[in-house]
């Protein structure tokens, strides 16, 4: 019989870049250490990650709402793991088949490129992205139009029911959020070079990657000093979302429209979908209880930064 545990965490490229204060990094680092101890004690045989992408692996040329990687590699953005992940191909295919049979349309990728949204939590929790077998599940959280949140919950439930059939200890990870509205190109606003990137996946040169990294650092500095047009963080909205998860009221989220999420949390707050899927996967096994409950509004990261751990009650 499977044992399922959960760890959801925000991610940020700025954790690996100059700018954030030592106090902030220490505060988040202390919480991550608690999460790491939780994961170490659970000692999973398999990890399933729910994560977004930031136009590093998925592009408007073909943009699935959901995709299961049967083989995957990190692109190495922002100093994260570059190279293959240990993806159990047979299990990943079984998972995708089970999800489809449950009535949730999901694509597969036999060569999924994953970025810091997938890899950073693995490195933070295990020290090495290759430390455990992992099945990466992509959830589109950036490229509009987006599906309703209830379909993300259905995805998580279907995956959770499949995982319950395995004789393994499985850790589900949700990566992203919470409220944040970083500068991300869109079809309507992207200049030609960026448009080619987000539509066709035009490769970025080293110089272009460094320029993007510098732009992210500058945007965070301006945001932290109140000199940015970006949408402010919304700690109250973040708290409401976290309370819903902590109390197990997942069906309440079915009423959250995409417009509401963007208005309250920012355009990239749609990354909460990864948390919804992860908690739904856990809840497929019954009632659960959360353990670590960390939250900090972090303008230096342009994010409401949260971490949760949970096990079945």
From Swiss-Prot:
It catalyses: 3-(2,3-dihydroxyphenyl)propanoate + O2 = (2Z,4E)-2-hydroxy-6-oxonona-2,4-dienedioate + H(+); (2E)-3-(2,3-dihydroxyphenyl)prop-2-enoate + O2 = (2Z,4E,7E)-2-hydroxy-6-oxonona-2,4,7-trienedioate + H(+). Its cofactor is Fe(2+). Its EC number is 1.13.11.16. One of its GO terms (biological process) is 3-phenylpropionate catabolic process. One of its GO terms (molecular function) is ferrous iron binding. SUPFAM superfamilies: LigB-like. Gene3D superfamilies: LigB-like. Keywords: Aromatic hydrocarbons catabolism, Dioxygenase, Iron, Oxidoreductase. It holds the Pfam family LigB. It comes from the Bacteria. InterPro entries: DHPP/DHXA_dioxygenase (IPR023789), Xdiol_dOase_suB (IPR004183). Pathway: Aromatic compound metabolism; 3-phenylpropanoate degradation. The active site is at 116 (proton donor), 180 (proton acceptor). Catalyzes the non-heme iron(II)-dependent oxidative cleavage of 2,3-dihydroxyphenylpropionic acid and 2,3-dihydroxicinnamic acid into 2-hydroxy-6-ketononadienedioate and 2-hydroxy-6-ketononatrienedioate, respectively. Homotetramer. Belongs to the LigB/MhpB extradiol dioxygenase family. This is 2,3-dihydroxyphenylpropionate/2,3-dihydroxicinnamic acid 1,2-dioxygenase. It comes from Mycobacterium sp. (strain KMS). The gene is mhpB.
């Amino acid at each position: 019989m499977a044992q399922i545990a959960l760890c959801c965490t925000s991610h940020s490229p700025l954790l690996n870049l100059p700018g954030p204060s030592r106090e902030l990094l220490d505060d988040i680092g202390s919480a991550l250490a608690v999460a790491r101890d939780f994961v170490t004690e659970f000692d999973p045989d398999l990890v399933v990650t729910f994560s977004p992408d930031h136009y590093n692996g998925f592009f408007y040329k073909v943009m699935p709402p959901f995709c299961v990687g049967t083989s995957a590699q990190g692109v190495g953005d922002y100093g994260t793991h570059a190279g293959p992940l240990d993806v159990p191909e047979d299990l990943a295919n079984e998972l995708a088949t089970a999800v489809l049979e449950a009535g949730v349309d999901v694509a597969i990728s036999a060569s999924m490129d994953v970025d810091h949204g997938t890899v950073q939590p693995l490195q933070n929790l295990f020290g090495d992205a290759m430390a455990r077998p992992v099945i990466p599940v992509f959830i589109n959280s950036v490229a509009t139009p987006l599906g309703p949140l209830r379909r993300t919950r259905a995805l998580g439930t279907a995956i959770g029911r499949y995982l319950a059939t395995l004789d393994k200890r499985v850790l589900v990870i949700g990566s992203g959020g919470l409220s944040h509205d970083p500068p991300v190109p869109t079809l309507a606003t992207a200049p030609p070079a960026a448009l080619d990137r987000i539509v066709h996946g035009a490769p970025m040169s080293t110089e272009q990657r460094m320029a993007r990294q510098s732009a992210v650092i500058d945007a965070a500095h301006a945001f932290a000093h109140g000199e940015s047009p970006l949408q402010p963080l919304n700690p109250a909205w973040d708290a409401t979302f976290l309370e819903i998860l902590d109390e197990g009221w997942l069906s309440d989220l079915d009423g959250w429209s995409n417009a509401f999420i963007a208005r309250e949390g920012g355009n990239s707050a749609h990354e909460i979908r990864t948390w919804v899927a992860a908690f739904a996967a856990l809840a497929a096994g019954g009632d659960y209880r959360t353990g670590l409950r960390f939250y900090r509004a972090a303008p230096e990261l342009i994010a409401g930064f949260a971490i949760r751990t949970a096990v079945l009650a």
